[in-house]
A protein has these predicted regions:
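Surface-exposed, charge/polar-rich loops and edge strands
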Residues: 1-186
Length: 186
């Protein structure tokens, strides 16, 4: 029994070190300088070590909103709001999670109103996030059950979209203004 406890103690310590290293890397990414989107999000997918990396991209919102049902923020139920952005530099589009809204006062069958994404060129800064697995649920028009990028792209009628997304931190229009947006998640 003592030998087993000894080995399990080292195993537990190794797990602690791995988690501490991962948490340190995530903290560095979360607070770090933003890098161009294409350095982190690629058509082959987000590398594990790049999760929560700050990215920036300039482009034009071209589709949305699509609402992610079954979300919560600070203990309140609601929806997250997704928009499709086409980068000015070309290449695949990227889905941007612009924030959180509470459900409509008229019930679950009515989607809430949200501030629109800005027209024209916008520079988005946020965190690279891995797309989610499909929950296999049929969703009403304009909604999805998870941030599964093929399902989101189908709801937005978008083609050529990256398999991962950006969680919005800030955005600025070409004239330097900050557009109105749903409640931030980051």
């Amino acid at each position: 029994f003592a030998v087993a406890c000894y080995h399990l103690g080292w195993w537990q310590y190794d797990r602690h070190l791995a988690k501490a290293e991962r948490n340190e890397r995530l903290d560095e990414h979360y607070r770090g300088e933003a890098v161009p989107l294409g350095e982190v999000l690629t058509p082959s997918g987000l590398a594990v070590q790049d999760g929560w990396r700050r990215v920036t991209v300039t482009g034009t919102y071209e589709a949305g909103p699509v609402f992610v049902r079954g979300r919560s923020l600070d203990g309140e139920a609601g929806l997250e709001v997704l928009w499709g952005l086409r980068p000015d530099a070309g290449g695949p589009g990227v889905v941007v999670n612009r924030g959180f809204v509470r459900p409509s006062d008229q019930g679950a069958s009515v989607l809430p109103s949200v501030p629109p994404a800005p027209d024209g060129e916008v520079t988005v800064t946020g965190w690279a996030r891995r797309g989610e697995a499909s929950r296999g649920k049929e969703a009403a028009a304009g909604t999805v059950a998870s941030i599964n990028l093929p399902e989101v792209a189908a709801q937005m009628a978008l083609t050529d979209v990256l398999p991962d997304y950006v969680l919005l931190d800030s955005e600025r229009t070409a004239d330097g203004t900050t557009p109105q947006r749903p409640q931030p998640l980051g």
